Structures are given as C-alpha cells and as structure tokens.
From Swiss-Prot:
This is Cyanide hydratase. Catalyzes the hydration of cyanide to formamide. Degradation of cyanide may be important for plant pathogenic fungi in infection of cyanogenic plants. Its EC number is 4.2.1.66. It is an enzyme of class 4 (lyase). SUPFAM superfamilies: Carbon-nitrogen hydrolase. The active site is at E55 (proton acceptor), K137, C172 (nucleophile). Residues 331-356 are annotated as: Disordered. It catalyses: formamide = hydrogen cyanide + H2O.
C-alpha cells in the first residue's frame, strides 16, 4: 500500500528532542511524579518538543529480584507494588496536565498497577495532554517475570502521529524481539524512544555482555539503523543511596553511582550526542530534521526497496499460533511438516532399551 507521511521525509524543519538520564525517586509514587514534571518543564524550557523517559521511571527499575532471593526481595517489592501508578489516576492526570502546559510530547515508562498486578508500561502523551498510546512490554525479561505480567496484544501497536513525525516506543529487550520489531517498522515510525533499565560496564562482576549498558545502547542503535529512524535512548542512574534502598548493594554486576548510557541516535546509527558520565543525571538534547531519514532510506529501506515480502513477512495471529514459521504455499507447508516429523523420529530405531 502506498505510504504518505506527514510530515514527510523531505521536511527540513529542525526541532529538538530530549533523552532523560536520571535517578528515579525510588519506591515513591508522589516523588516520582514530581520529578517527572520537573524534568518535563526543564526540557521544555530548553526547547525540546519530544522527551523520552527510561523504563519504569516511576517508581524505578527493580533490579532487586536479580540481586536477592524472593524472600529478601519481598519487602522491597511490596513497597514497589504500593508505589506503582495506575493508568487512570490523579498522578497520571497531573503528568498529562504538565505535558499540555509545557506543549511537548513525551514517552513515559512506568510500573503500571492494574488491581494488584504490575506491568512494564509506556504511555505516549501528546501536547494536548491526551494519552495517544498506552502499551505494556509484551514479555518481561528473566527475573522481571516474578513481578510483572505480559503485555496484551494491543501493545504491539506502538507508533502514533505527532506534529513532529510518527513517534514509537520500545522497552528494553523488546529491541531484540525480531517479529515485534518487524511489526513496529511496518507502522512507519520516524522517531522512537527506547526506554531502558540501569545497566553497567561489560562483564562487571562476571556479568554477561548482553546485560551491559554498552550492549543495551547497541540494541537501540541497531533499531535506528535497521528502521532508518531517530532513536532517543533513555536510562536510569543509580546512586549508592538508591542501591541501598533497592537492596542492590553487594551484587557483583553493579557499580555505584552508575547505570547510565543515554544517547540520541540518527537514522544512520550515528550518535548525535556526546558520551556522558554513567553516574550523572543529565538530559541530552539533539536538533533533528526528518529529511535525514531519506539519506538512509535511499540506500536501504527495509519496508520498501530493501525488502522481499514475497518471501518473508510477519503474520499477526492474535495469540492463536505458536509456530515461529508458517508457509503460505500448502505444498511447502506439507513438506515442512514432513521434514519436522523426520527430525522428531530420527534415531528412534537405534535406541537400545534399558535392561535395568
């Protein structure tokens, strides 16, 4: 289907975007709302039109169950639950009003409380103060599953129109979910906010490289290059006092203060901001214009000139299909099933029954 974007990739208007690197007000809903509003006003005063916040900035990212057994973590997690924010709440209304008064657009990461359950959520709030998009991380990562539920199917719709372009959102390791990303790119985002946890230098305390700040930043950089869009990468800072409150002290993967790796990427993957101290609270700014997207997509547009949808495409099946691959041609599908059956049965005739 032909696509007409407004504003288009020929638009040379320059505007400012902002990436937040800040320490949450740990386990404090009201304090977190106050700090979020302060940052919105600060960034608006600097001329930012789009502001990105980290993953679950309210009330902070809970590394706690990674660093403790569940019994020891529970006292923190109870407070975490109590200070998570419902979507429809006076606290969210205050943030929406602040966005409207500041005349900005934001993507905010927060721990959403729905009844007694928690979800890793993002809202895109446009300059009229309306929630243009609400989504939940589709699959919590590793120990996150002990706290947070899965996002619902509507969470794959994560791109909205703003006066400054089509604005998308991803949370943490959603950046390495291939099928989610394909659906994301199919919505033609021009700018996205990557909301991230606090992450630390590679191999700190024997940690796997994939959980490092460097790896996390590269995941967002790949989305910018792959999709040909601007990336606003936002993450936490953790002080020693914050680590003590969240029971993170003593776990070998962490160094305090630290956790930050915020950056803004261009659609070619180039960093538009200078590296910053991982332990420093800062709001990063970059002036961007959408015409730079065409410079990249002239070479490789994965939703256009650099695609083969006649060979590979993603089918959204509303949770009814568990298979990672399906063939449109019935003969190919039958051949695939026969091949899988052969694999499943391989070696069965050579198994020697036990004599025990």
């Amino acid at each position: 289907m032909p696509i007409s974007l407004n504003p288009s990739h020929s638009n040379t208007q320059t505007f400012k975007v902002a990436a937040v690197q800040a320490e949450p007000v740990w386990l404090d809903l009201q304090g977190g709302v106050e700090k979020t509003i302060r940052i919105i006003n600060e960034a608006a005063a600097e001329g930012a039109k789009i502001i990105g916040f980290p993953e679950v900035f309210i009330p902070g990212y809970p590394w706690t169950p990674w660093a403790n057994n569940f019994v020891d973590a529970q006292v923190v997690l109870k407070k975490y639950q109590a200070n998570s924010m419902p979507l429809h709440s006076p606290e969210m209304d205050r943030i929406r009003e602040a966005v409207k008064e500041a005349d900005v657009n934001i993507v905010l990461g927060f721990s959403e409380r729905d009844g007694s359950s928690l979800y890793i959520a993002q809202v895109t709030i446009t300059s009229d103060g309306k929630i243009a998009n609400h989504r939940r991380k589709i699959k919590p990562t590793h120990y996150e599953k002990t706290i947070f539920g899965d996002g619902s199917a509507q969470s794959i719709y994560n791109v909205v129109q703003t006066p400054y372009g089509r604005l998308g959102s991803l949370n943490c390791w959603e950046h390495i979910q291939p099928w989610l990303k394909t659906h994301f790119y199919s919505q033609y985002p021009q700018i996205f906010v990557g909301g991230w946890w606090p992450a630390f230098p590679p191999h700190t305390g024997g940690s796997p490289y994939i959980v490092s700040g460097e790896a996390s930043s590269r995941m967002s950089q790949l989305v910018s290059m792959e999709g040909g869009l601007f990336g606003i990468v936002c993450c936490h800072v953790v002080s020693e006092a914050g680590a003590r409150k969240m029971r993170m002290l003593g776990f070998p993967w962490f160094t305090f203060p630290g956790g930050g790796f915020s950056v803004i990427y261009g659609p070619d993957g180039a960093a538009l901001t200078d590296p910053v101290d991982p332990g420093k609270e800062v709001v990063l700014y970059a002036n961007i214009s959408l015409d730079k997207i065409d410079d990249v997509k002239l070479v490789a547009d994965i939703m256009g000139n650099y695609s083969r949808f006649d060979l590979f495409h993603t089918t959204v099946v509303n949770g009814k299909n568990w298979k990672p691959v399906a063939y449109g041609d019935p003969d190919e599908q039958a051949a695939s099933k026969a091949q899988q059956a052969e694999i499943d049965n391989a070696g069965k005739g050579s198994i020697v029954p036990s004599k025990l």
